[in-house]
Amino acid sequence: EKIDFFVNVLRFIKSNAIALFNETSLVSQSGGQTSRLDSLKNCLLKLKQKKKKTTIGKLYLFSDAFFPFTDTLKLIKSEKLRIDVYAPMGSKNDSLIEKFVKENKFNFIKLSDRHFKH
């Protein structure tokens, strides 16, 4: 299944990993940053440089760990991309994340495991 493939790719990216996939392949990834927000900014910059943003269609975003704040989700919303978000939970702010996801009608899928690579 593609979800298993996406998770396996994510496991090999440095901590604070964000990976963006289309239906069949990795289209952008970033890790080793001080935050997942910075990793997402790098991913989006790479997409824009490749000029894929407008032709990419639906994307799947995978995070190696939970989102401690809504900042990453707010950036996704501001980019107006069709993105399904896959991430584990476990932050003390999970209730804020869940509230934001519900209010903004995100397709948010909870993963059972974290995949840090230090």
Language-model-derived ranges and their functions:
Residues 10-13, 51-55, 77-78, 116:
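Solvent-exposed alpha-helices and their adjacent loops that cap or buttress functional pockets
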Residues 17-24:
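Short beta-strand scaffold segments in enzyme catalytic cores
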Residues 5-8, 42, 46, 75, ...:
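Alpha-helical scaffold segments in soluble metabolic enzymes
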Residues 74-118:
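C-terminal binding/interaction regions
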Residues 16-17, 59, 104:
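Structural beta-strand/beta-sheet cores of well-ordered domains, especially the beta-sheet scaffolds
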Residues 1-17:
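Short, basic/aromatic recognition patches
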Residues 25-73:
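Glycine- and Gly-Pro-enriched alpha-helical subdomains that act as flexible
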